[in-house]
């Protein structure tokens, strides 16, 4: 298919997100279209459309094989995630930026960049797969999650200060 874009980084990154995560992006697009069709002008966006928009713009998928690290993220326990369990975070998680607005922010990084992260449980074998296989797996898992969670709200996403992620920023 074709992806309409304007001449700016925001649309370029949206196009790249479509190429990298076609199943997940298609689900997000379909969910937004359904929410738009249902919504009346008086209601505003509503919780589903809010969540879809936030994730589409600022989403990050965190593949995670550790319940302890997933819980640390849900508790906003940055010390555990980024300092005390730094090696485990490097070995048992893999972040995938899916939000095109997030990618645009990362062109000129600043300390306070915070993604809206969807934690996707994976087993240890995930980390032995090739990067292409892992990306394809993440695309499928996110698409499946979106298909099977009709009550998606922004509360399903965890704030994640991305420059705190081990390996994402030279000053870290």
What are these regions (language model features)?
Residues 1-40:
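Hydrophobic alpha-helical segments and helix pairs
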């Amino acid at each position: 298919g074709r992806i309409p874009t304007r001449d700016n980084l925001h649309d370029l990154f949206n196009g790249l997100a479509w190429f990298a995560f076609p199943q997940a992006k298609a689900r997000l697009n379909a969910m937004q279209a359904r929410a738009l069709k249902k919504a009346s002008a008086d209601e505003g966006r509503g919780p589903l459309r809010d969540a879809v928009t936030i994730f589409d713009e600022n989403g990050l998928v965190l593949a995670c094989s550790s319940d302890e690290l997933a819980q640390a993220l849900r508790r906003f326990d940055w010390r555990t995630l980024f300092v005390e369990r730094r090696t485990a975070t490097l070995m048992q998680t893999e972040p995938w930026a899916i939000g095109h607005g997030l990618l645009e922010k990362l062109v000129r990084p600043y300390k306070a960049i915070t993604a809206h992260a969807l934690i996707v449980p994976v087993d240890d074998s995930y980390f032995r797969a090739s990067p292409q296989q892992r990306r394809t797996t993440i695309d499928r898992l996110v698409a499946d999650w979106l298909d099977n969670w009709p009550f998606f709200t922004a509360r399903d996403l965890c704030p994640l200060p991305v420059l705190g992620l081990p390996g994402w920023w030279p000053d870290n």
